[in-house]
């Protein structure tokens, strides 16, 4: 992923609600939970120390922790703590002093680290929610092959003018969301940060994505408490949510948030998985599965988009929130069909959560 690594200084970042307490004497290792944090320590901090540095030609491997942001891709605080419980500064002590920075925590930090890597020149990766399934599948693959597959799908979809998605609900309704992509070059998340250019990968990788220019229609969503709703999209913005089933208070809270800070409803991404992987129950891997698609609202500057944190009324709202459509995650909705239009060409991309013949042929090409 990070070739060349010779001479690179590496550190590992994670997060806790009380990092000073958790890091002092590494007390979190004796506490319940903290699966991602313990994996960061065991497989990366100790893995580098016990042979990894020698194999890669790297040094460092230090573990640091910051206060958990409780939001996807929110800017990180400047304060963080080392294994002795001593407080340090990201801008003074971390970003200028490490060549490769790995973030393995509760929430994604791809957006803030992407902004900082351009300022300080490091390379890195974010691997939030890392569990044993991810370690043994999405992170245990040949990333040259992941990159090649992502490129095959990217070429098959690049310069798309529009994508339409039909969602079939259990009550028989079919909702359609139409996304205007303006013929833009498709991008890929392929996991490789090779060379010396500053970049931050999102791992596990394997997706093709676009930043929508416009969007209209409706699509369903599933809230964290299991409530199901229909979102109305007008001029790229989610305007309102309507209850399908579950808790009306959840819908009301979302509508209040949309009224209070409309940028939280702006669509910032359309993505398609390109890999065959097992379900991990973490969106970071599951959105990379072939046959799934996802939309995201909010911040998208790390994807080359125009939605930056300063545009939100409240800092805590400047998240990048993925809405994944996958059989295990949204069994109440079927992605009946995804269609791409590119000039005079029209292709089906997904049918009933399965990649279309067009996509399978693209993946088979050049092998």
Language-model segments: what does each one mean?
Residues 1-218, 223-226, 339-367:
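Active-site bordering "gate/hinge" segments
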Residues 158, 172, 212-214, 263-265, ...:
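A generic structural signal for short, non-catalytic loop/turn and secondary-structure boundary residues
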Residues 208-253:
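Oxyanion-binding "anion nests"
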Residues 240-309:
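Dual-mode signal for accessory low-complexity, basic/Gly-rich regions
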Residues 295, 300-366:
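Internal helix-turn-beta structural module
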């Amino acid at each position: 992923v990070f070739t060349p690594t010779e001479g690179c200084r590496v550190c590992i970042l994670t997060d806790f609600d009380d990092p000073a307490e958790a890091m002092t004497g590494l007390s979190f290792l004796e506490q319940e939970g903290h699966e991602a944090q313990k994996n960061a320590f065991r497989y990366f901090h100790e893995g580098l120390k016990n042979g990894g540095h020698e194999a890669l030609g790297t040094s460092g491997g230090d573990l640091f922790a910051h206060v958990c942001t409780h939001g996807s891709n929110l800017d990180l605080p400047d304060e963080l703590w080392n294994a002795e419980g001593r407080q340090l500064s990201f801008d003074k002590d971390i970003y200028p002093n490490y060549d490769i920075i790995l973030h393995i925590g509760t929430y994604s930090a791809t957006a803030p680290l992407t902004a900082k890597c351009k300022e300080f020149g490091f390379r890195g990766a974010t691997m939030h929610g890392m569990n044993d399934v991810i370690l043994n599948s999405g992170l245990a693959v040949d990333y040259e092959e992941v990159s090649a597959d992502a490129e095959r799908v990217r070429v098959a979809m690049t310069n798309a003018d529009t994508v339409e998605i039909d969602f079939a609900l259990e009550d028989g309704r079919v909702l359609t969301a139409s996304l205007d992509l303006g013929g833009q070059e498709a991008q890929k998340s392929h996991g490789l940060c090779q060379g010396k250019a500053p970049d931050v990968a999102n791992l596990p990788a394997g997706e093709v994505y676009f930043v929508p220019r416009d969007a209209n229609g409706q699509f369903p969503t599933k809230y964290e408490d299991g409530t199901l709703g229909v979102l109305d999209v007008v001029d790229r913005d989610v305007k309102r949510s309507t209850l399908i089933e579950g808790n009306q208070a959840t819908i009301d809270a979302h509508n209040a948030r949309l009224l209070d800070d409309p940028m939280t409803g702006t669509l910032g991404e359309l993505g398609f998985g390109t890999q065959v992987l097992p379900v991990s129950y973490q969106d970071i891997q599951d959105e990379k599965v072939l046959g799934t698609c996802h939309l995201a609202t909010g911040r998208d500057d790390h994807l080359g988009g125009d939605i930056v944190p300063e545009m939100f009324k409240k800092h805590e709202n400047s998240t990048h929130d993925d809405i994944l459509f996958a059989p295990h995650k949204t069994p109440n909705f079927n992605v009946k069909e995804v269609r791409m239009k590119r000039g005079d060409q029209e292709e089906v991309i997904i049918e009933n959560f399965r990649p279309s013949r067009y996509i399978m042929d693209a993946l088979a090409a050049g092998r």
